[in-house]
């Protein structure tokens, strides 16, 4: 492997969240030292994921099925839709095991600074799902940040005129907090004590 190929690997690893240039360099060296036990299985797993995992056309989560296993599960409560920023937030709620409804993954939050508008988040898809029924409540499980609150208000303005209850997570989610970093107990309490937006 030439230095250029190693540099390319380091550069790609550095693009992953939480990995800077130094961490990416260490990860690359670790992979290279453990080719058979780590790098080859990792390449195999990445290839399999790239070939089989896709976004659910209904809710936007990642799955090997379309629609995903959550959307296809008849035991899930179709009257509740929990709106989350991204798949990591959905996984955090599923880990808690307290929500039995369906989800809608936005894929981000509204942000004038970053140029992210309602059309970028597929809010029209959410409105269409609500209009199709049998939804009676939309739970906004969004971060307690400026962008999260802005997104929540836009969604509430879109959904409430349809006569649907719109609620948000209650206490337990700190201002500026990220759902993926909360412990299961805090997340469970916040979901159970949700409130109208």
Curated annotation (Swiss-Prot):
Keyword flag Zinc: yes
GO molecular function: DNA binding; zinc ion binding
Protein transport found in the keyword field: no
InterPro entries associated with the record: DNA_Rcmb_RecR, Rcmb_RecR, Rcmb_RecR_Znf, TOPRIM_dom, TOPRIM_RecR
Keywords of the record: DNA damage, DNA recombination, DNA repair, Metal-binding, Zinc, Zinc-finger
Domain Toprim: 79-174
C4-type zinc finger span: 56-71
Lineage top rank: taxon: Bacteria
Listed Gene3D superfamilies: 3.40.1360.10, 6.10.250.240, RecR Domain 1 (1.10.8.420)
Gene Ontology annotations of biological process type: DNA recombination; DNA repair
Pfam families (alphabetical): RecR_C (PF21175), RecR_HhH (PF21176), RecR_ZnF (PF02132), Toprim_4 (PF13662)
Protein function: May play a role in DNA repair. It seems to be involved in an RecBC-independent recombinational process of DNA repair. It may act with RecF and RecO.
Family membership: Belongs to the RecR family.
Entry-linked PANTHER family: RECOMBINATION PROTEIN RECR
The protein, known as: Recombination protein RecR
Classification of source organism: Bacteria, Pseudomonadati, Pseudomonadota, Alphaproteobacteria, Rhodospirillales
């Amino acid at each position: 492997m030439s230095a250029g190929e190693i540099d390319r690997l380091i550069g790609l690893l550095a693009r992953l969240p939480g990995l800077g240039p130094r961490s990416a360099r260490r990860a690359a060296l670790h992979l290279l030292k453990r080719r058979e036990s780590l790098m080859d299985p990792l390449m195999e797993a990445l290839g399999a994921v790239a070939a089989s995992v896709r976004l659910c056309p209904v809710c936007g989560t990642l799955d090997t099925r379309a629609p995903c296993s959550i959307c296809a599960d008849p035991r899930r409560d179709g009257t509740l839709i929990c709106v989350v920023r991204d798949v990591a937030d959905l996984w955090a709620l599923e880990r808690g095991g307290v929500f039995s409804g369906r989800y809608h993954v936005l894929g981000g939050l509204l942000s004038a600074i970053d140029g992210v508008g309602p059309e970028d988040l597929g809010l029209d898809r959410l409105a269409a799902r609500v209009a199709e029924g049998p939804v009676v409540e939309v739970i906004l499980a969004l971060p307690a940040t400026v962008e999260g609150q802005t997104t929540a208000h836009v969604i509430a303005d879109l959904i409430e005129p349809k006569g649907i209850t719109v609620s948000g997570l209650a206490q337990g989610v700190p201002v500026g907090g990220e759902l993926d970093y909360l412990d299961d107990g805090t997340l469970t309490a916040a979901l159970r004590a949700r409130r109208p937006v």
